[in-house]
Amino acid sequence: SGSNLTTV
């Protein structure tokens, strides 16, 4: 499984 977290 893969998860992506992007905070700008």
UniProtKB/Swiss-Prot annotation:
Top-level class of the enzyme under EC nomenclature: hydrolase
EC identifiers of the protein: 3.4.23.-
Keywords: Aspartyl protease, Glycoprotein, Hydrolase, Protease, Secreted
Residue ranges crossing the lipid bilayer per the database entry: none
GO molecular function annotation: aspartic-type endopeptidase activity
Tissue specificity note: Chorionic epithelium (trophectoderm) and placental cotyledons.
One Gene Ontology term from the biological process aspect of the record: proteolysis
Glycosylation: residue positions: 4
Domain of life where this protein originates: Eukaryota
GO cellular component: extracellular region
UniProt-annotated location(s): Secreted, Extracellular space
Note: On the 2D-gel the determined pI of this protein is: 5.4, its MW is: 50 kDa.
Family that this chain belongs to: Belongs to the peptidase A1 family.
Protein name listed in UniProt: Pregnancy-associated glycoprotein 50I
Originating organism: Bison bonasus
